[in-house]
Amino acid sequence: MTQIRPFCGLRPVPEYAAEIAALPYDVMDTEEARQILNKNPLSFLRVTKSEATMSDCIDPHSQAVYKMAKTNLDRYLSDGQMKKDTTPCYYIYRQQMGQHIQIGLVAAASVEEYRENIIKKHELTRHDKEQDRVNHILATEAQTGAVFLTYKGKPEINTYVLSLMGAKKPVYDFTSEDGVQHTLYVVENLMEIAELTRLFEDVPVMYIADGHHRSAAAMRVADELGKTPRHGSNEEYNTFLAVIFPDNMMQIMDYNRLVKDLNGLSMEEFLSRVGEKFEISELENGPKPEARHQFSMYLTGKWRRLTAKEGTFAADDVIGSLDVSILQDNLLAPILGIKDPRTDERINFMGGIRGLDVLASKVDAGAYSVAFAMYPTSMEELIKVADAGKIMPPKSTWFEPKLRDAMVVHLIGEDE
């Protein structure tokens, strides 16, 4: 049983929604954010990457940066560009990227259910990244970025959500510069809110798809603010901003690997070592892997197909049978010397949204010696890992389309 609740969202006035809504803070660096803000000063990156509105030499983790985030957030309200809903609402967020459509419910999810693993995790978090989000939430008194949650889809929820969409007009409907259509509906009717809440009570567990640092930070903030004696369990900080999608609407793309050198091996030595654990063949149908346990390798201007040999991985191991584990355990670590992909500077990662031509061009330009195109991790694999209480290897999943920040913001201050 999961418990969600509506909240009074802070969101853009409709005429400003397309300009304010922004990609998440963690998919770009400060310079990229600065370039976006130069073109579009209203972008919510003013809040989520407020260092981009300050001097080049500013420490992005200084208190001045978090204070600037609060100043910039307040300015949206004082300038009349964002307003807070006066009654608690749910929000339906529809995204379309090409032929792919996903429809999620924006709601306040329970910190306590996260703590009790009713909301399940599959990634490790880094303390420094958690602390950054803690500082940001405390300074702004807001959760500005949503946690991307999923659940095993239920037809009755889908049917009801679609019926609500059919009966309402969207408050926003715009296409962002990356070609993704974003549509938002507000659910403010008390009976409709009660029905959505009831329907989700029949969902036994939910899973974090993306946003492990945001959810971990929300729990730490709740622990800190919960020390205030006069506060109770209904405080807004005991929940976190989430967009909840059924698993059958989620789209995971490939998360590909680039390695700077061959670890001192010649090309012939490298291919010989690779051939011990993988069948190597010529590619006939383009570079994308066509099935699990297949990989496409780009080396010296040529794509090759790698297929994991039988017996080189434990097929019944939920972690060991993942393609990212097979490549790491049988090639990246033993042959290329990449022992810890989280920290090794010789490896880089690229989301499949950028395409395999870009991957190959990085090798052709000499920045890397070899690239590996992956078959996407499936939602079924992610859920199995989370249900087993295990941790996915780093850089296993790349979700598209990305949620836009500022579609709805969750305020957690004392007056909320």
For the regions a protein language model found, what residue spans apply to each?
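Surface-exposed, charge/polar-rich loops and edge strands
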Residues: 1-416
